[in-house]
């Protein structure tokens, strides 16, 4: 006789309905899982599974493969979730501050100093911390989603900023390509950096609101 267990596990890293849907889908695909549902507001996964076929550790591994995390330590799940949420919020704050410190000069240069010699190189250098530090998680999560043929908000941010940055990088390195066509090589570093900065602000506000909501639900 199969042993069906019903568990509720906190999920870390979800930001939208697509995230919740992707977590639900990946868990349901696991052998031994009878049913699974995600509550985005409370940030929890409710799952019915055959503990003889699949373990909580295997469910956690499956969820981590698409860029999220599952807290399976039932004895300390509440404390661990609160700790993880606080740590993530502080990290998000740092990344948001760094993004704006570099994005504002890039945007300012793009508006007022485009005729300044070597300005594209300055904008390139200032864009790097925004994309590769502040925006790093967008690209990692988008890649994890892509490997499982799914997508979420991170996919949109990663695609739009990558296209803007790579096109600008090409125009910075090979401006002659456009000059030979009789065209001016334009760059869009400010678009890539400002998108990341604004989305991070949104995530920060969302995380704060979500923390209050989930705390109220737990009470």
Positions of PLM-derived features:
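Flexible metal-binding regulatory segments at protein termini and peripheral loops
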Residues: 1-118, 153, 210
